[in-house]
């Protein structure tokens, strides 16, 4: 922190729909660049680990498992960095699935925030 300010960045990774491994590699690279530039908090788009337009695939256990593995890989690859990263991914909770922002730093999950408003895409 310099002069009481926190350096924050937003990043938009290249994303392939339902390719969590590719997406996590893109996210890793952007986190490393931001960390090298002294960024303290980096924010990514919602569902950036899986891609936003997976539609029916969000109901598949395999996609959720791959997203979780991708998150673990990001956490492992950024374990030595001080940067706080906020990434979007689908999360299973009991019998429901949520679109959530996951806050991570130094290989730990600090919070999971579910999206509170889900558009129905029939709105004008």
Name what the model sees in each region.
Residues 1-124:
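Hydrophobic structural segments
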């Amino acid at each position: 922190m310099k002069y009481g300010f926190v350096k924050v960045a937003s990043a938009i990774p290249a994303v392939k729909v339902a390719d969590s491994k590719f997406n996590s590699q893109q996210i890793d690279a952007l986190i490393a660049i931001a960390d090298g530039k002294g960024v303290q908090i980096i924010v990514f788009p919602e569902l950036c680990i899986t891609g936003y337009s997976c539609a029916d695939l969000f109901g598949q256990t395999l996609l959720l498992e791959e997203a979780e593995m991708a998150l673990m890989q990001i956490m492992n690859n950024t374990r030595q960095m001080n940067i706080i990263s906020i990434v979007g991914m689908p999360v299973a909770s009991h019998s429901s699935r949520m679109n959530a922002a996951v806050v991570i730093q130094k290989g730990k999950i600090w919070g999971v925030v579910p999206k509170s408003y889900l558009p129905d895409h029939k709105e004008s």
